[in-house]
């Protein structure tokens, strides 16, 4: 209609924020409106979807595009109907001891307050009914049960917070008019793409005035399952060592700016790379578990099933408003994460919101749970803070005060990366309170794999490509373990307690 046409007319006129993607020598790129155009538009009951092709040009042409005179970028805009005010929904104050995504508002009329900002958390309104996710027909039938388990696992935490059966998963609609782009649904989508390490993402949309979550989409990439079956990832995933970590905040105080850091560190922009790293870790685990990898074995099928459940649990946590918690693995001892009975009940970490690696047993010991497929104590704690009905801010503070318990501690993205990441316990893809001991076990597994690599490859008349990629998988594990172990030299413990 008219509103959609007016919105579309203005869409390609601005490349705000997109030029930052070029960075460095291409920072002078600007939008060329004469070579930008609309690809598609769609009007839905509560949202409009517009896809445009934006062409940027400037000095320092990119050599990786067909025509160096301009760089085309496809951009998708989603324009939502303004949510109606609901006086029954009470915004909930944020607390830096519990990890939620935030909405921040500046109070202009109170100069006596300690801070001009009011911070509230993103959360669903459960008083109107359950959160309903809709499985799309894109999700292969053989994987739907594993994905559904990962979503419904969160009901255990909501039940303790006073909302039993707070989440529901509907089967794919039979209505041919169903459109997964319609924000009245919260779809579970399945894609396949060329990047063999991307695995999942879960963006959500919240009302900036109240923090009420309006919509979420769970997107899972099926191509990563090929990487898990083979024991290597085609796309080499480098260890996450942001450029800022190599610079000194003393020499350049601007490096401590979260705004600056967000430009070079994707985790501070709300991005999640858990699934990407877990795929690489899963490929390493496949090499360690299967002397002769069989992509279609029963063990591989079980491995993939658990991977999908664990990944979905993590992504649904984001859909519920939760941020990462990278100190959660420190809650359990090395002996506990090696104990199959313990991990079956408590998991391998205190939270599914950590970047939990695969828990490989040392040689000669029984194998515990591979993945975090149960909620940890921090997950129950975080849902209690965000969703349990309370009568006053005192009740909220009382809940947050329990964060001093070891298994309820919280540390997130800005604590784990960059020049201020000084606490070695806050780590990505590490387990237990004895990280050095755990990484030593990983080095031993990698040594064993290197020693037998030539005996395993090539196989079945194939080329040496598989061996080269498997070599890269093992080498990546060496690099990651070495980097995380080195952080213990000169590190310092931090705390959010107050």
PLM region spans:
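Generic detector of contiguous secondary-structure segments
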Residues: 262-264, 314, 467-469
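Soluble non-cytosolic domains of exported or imported proteins
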Residues: 137, 141-149, 302-307, 311, ...
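Sec-exported extracytoplasmic/periplasmic mature domains
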Residues: 152-163, 317-318, 322, 358, ...
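Amphipathic alpha-helical segments that form well-ordered structural scaffolds
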Residues: 146, 150-157, 311-315, 477
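Conserved catalytic/binding loops enriched for acidic/polar residues
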Residues: 291, 298-303, 328-498
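The catalytic-center signature of Zn2+-dependent metalloproteases
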Residues: 171-193, 197, 306-362
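Short conserved micro-motifs at the rims of enzyme active sites and ligand-binding pockets
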Residues: 145, 200, 227-231, 362-370
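Auxiliary tRNA-acceptor-end handling modules of aminoacyl-tRNA synthetases
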Residues: 1-139, 157, 161, 166, ...
């Amino acid at each position: 209609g008219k509103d959609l046409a007016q919105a579309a007319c203005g869409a390609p006129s601005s490349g705000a924020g997109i030029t930052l993607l070029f960075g460095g020598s291409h920072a002078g790129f600007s939008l060329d409106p004469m070579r930008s155009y609309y690809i598609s538009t769609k009007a839905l009951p509560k949202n409009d979807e517009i896809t445009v092709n934006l062409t940027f040009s400037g000095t320092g042409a990119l050599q990786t595009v067909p025509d160096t005179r301009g760089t085309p970028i496809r951009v998708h805009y989603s324009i939502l109907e303004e949510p109606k005010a609901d006086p029954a929904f009470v915004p909930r104050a944020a607390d830096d001891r519990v990890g939620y995504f935030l909405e921040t508002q500046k109070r202009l009329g109170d100069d006596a307050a300690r801070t001009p900002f009011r911070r509230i958390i993103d959360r669903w309104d459960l008083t109107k009914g359950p959160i309903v996710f809709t499985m799309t027909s894109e999700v292969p039938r053989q994987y739907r049960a594993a994905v559904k388990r990962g979503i419904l696992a969160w009901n255990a935490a909501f039940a303790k917070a006073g909302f039993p059966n707070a989440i529901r998963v509907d089967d794919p609609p039979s209505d041919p008019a169903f459109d997964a782009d319609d924000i009245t649904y919260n779809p579970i989508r399945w894609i396949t793409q060329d990047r063999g390490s991307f695995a999942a993402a879960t963006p959500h949309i919240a009302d900036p005035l109240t923090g009420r979550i309006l919509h979420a989409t769970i997107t899972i990439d099926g191509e990563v399952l090929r990487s898990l079956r083979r024991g290597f990832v085609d796309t080499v995933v480098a260890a996450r060592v942001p450029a800022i970590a190599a610079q000194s905040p003393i020499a350049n105080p601007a490096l401590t700016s979260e705004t600056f850091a967000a430009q070079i560190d994707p985790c501070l922009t709300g991005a999640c790379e858990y699934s990407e790293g877990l795929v690489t870790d899963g490929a390493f685990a496949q090499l360690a578990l299967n002397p002769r990898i069989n992509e279609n074995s029963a063990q591989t099928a079980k491995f993939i099933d658990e991977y999908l459940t664990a990944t979905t649990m993590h992504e649904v946590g984001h859909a519920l408003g939760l941020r990462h918690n990278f100190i959660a693995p420190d809650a359990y001892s090395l002996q506990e994460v090696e104990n199959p009975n313990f991990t079956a009940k408590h998991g391998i970490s205190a939270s599914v919101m950590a970047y939990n690696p695969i828990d490989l047993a040392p040689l000669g010991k029984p194998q515990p749970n591979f993945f975090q497929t149960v909620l940890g104590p921090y997950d129950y704690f975080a849902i209690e803070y965000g969703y349990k009905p309370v009568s006053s801010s005192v009740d909220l503070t009382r809940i947050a005060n329990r964060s001093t318990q070891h298994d309820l501690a919280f540390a997130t993205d800005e604590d784990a990366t960059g020049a201020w990441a000084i606490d070695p316990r806050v780590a990505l893809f590490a387990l237990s309170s004895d990280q050095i001991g755990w990484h030593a076990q990983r080095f031993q597994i990698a040594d064993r794999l290197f020693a037998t690599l030539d005996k395993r490859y090539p196989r079945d008349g194939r080329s040496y490509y598989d061996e080269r990629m498997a070599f890269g998988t093992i080498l990546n594990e060496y690099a990651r373990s070495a980097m995380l172990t080195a952080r213990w030299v000169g590190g310092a413990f931090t705390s959010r307690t107050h």
